[in-house]
Structure formats: C-alpha cells, structure tokens
Design a protein with these regions (language model features):
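A short aromatic-anchored loop/beta-hairpin motif
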Residues: 1-116, 120-169
C-alpha cells in the first residue's frame, strides 16, 4: 500500500475527519500504515526568516487526526539523509529545520514541499477492511501526481471521473 493514493468514498461523508479526503500512504510497517491528507489545506502557515531579507511562508495542511503536535513534510526533492522515499520523485520526513536550511541554501524550492500537521494512521489490517467495506477507493494514479491533489476541491473533481456510481456526488 505504500505509495498508493486513496480517496474517501461517499460512504464516509458523515465522517468529518475524512470527509472528501484524498490520502497518500507514505509508510507501511509491521505496526500499520501512515498516510497524509493531501487536500485539506488549513488557514495556517509556517513562516521563518532566512537570510536578512527573505521570509519563507509555507501553507500548513491537516495530515490527519494522529500526532497533531508534530509536522510532516512531503517533497519532490531528495536529501537522502533527512527523508524517506515513497516512490519516484516523492519523499517524506519531519525535520523542519533541515527543510528551512535547504530552502535557504537554494537546494529546495518551497513550492516543491507540502507541510502537514498530524497524520492518518491505520492498524495493519484495518485499512484493508475499510477498503473492502467501500470506505476507500484506491486510485490507479502515479504517486508523482500527488501534488496535483493539493486543492480543497480535488475530491469533487476526482469522484466524478470514477464512473456512474459516483457521478451524483
């Protein structure tokens, strides 16, 4: 499942946490799966002054209901020591200071980063059960397209492409 993109089915419309969510599964361990909600931008952002005249401002997204006091990064650039590869040209990590250093040094463009507060998590068999119960739809998309789902209205656009069953949503 690592690297898969999930879209919440209309069966989850009453679940306010995952309502109209698009999630990228970023990690799978023996304990479970970790995902980040791609299309839930908040009204918050992180800023940092770098150098004497440059201020970096990165939008903050709601990654999910777990560990909301931690930040996670999704980026299209690799820095082998501080990130975990998800798939082709897509990495995740959690070192904000290193990220700002990379931006300051011109090694990463802030447009190539999504910053999340919290993450979504499932026990090892839990997500498979939820998919089997039609709570989630696994998209057959390339993960390098993950940045295309950043807008809040992405769910509406995608659900209409999934066939007659979902067109009314």
């Amino acid at each position: 499942m690592k690297g898969k993109i999930l879209i919440s089915s209309p069966n989850l419309l009453s679940d306010m946490v995952f309502y109209k969510s698009i999630i990228l599964i970023v990690d799978k361990t023996e304990d479970g799966l970790t995902g980040l909600i791609l299309n839930r931008r908040s009204d918050l952002f992180i800023t940092k002054d770098i150098k004497s005249t440059i201020k970096v401002k990165i939008d903050l997204y709601y990654g999910g209901p777990v560990s909301n006091n931690h930040y996670y990064l999704l980026k299209s650039e690799s820095d082998q020591s501080e990130s975990i590869k998800i798939g082709k040209n897509l990495y995740w990590g959690n070192n904000l200071e290193y990220l700002f250093d990379q931006i300051e040094d011109g090694l990463i463009d802030q447009q190539d980063v999504i910053l999340f507060q919290g993450y979504s998590g499932w026990n090892i068999d839990q997500l498979d059960d939820e998919i089997e119960n039609d709570s989630w739809i696994v998209l057959n998309d390339q993960i390098e397209n993950a940045f295309n789902y950043k807008e809040n209205n992405s769910w509406n656009k995608i659900i209409k492409t999934l066939g007659k069953k979902y067109r009314i949503w």
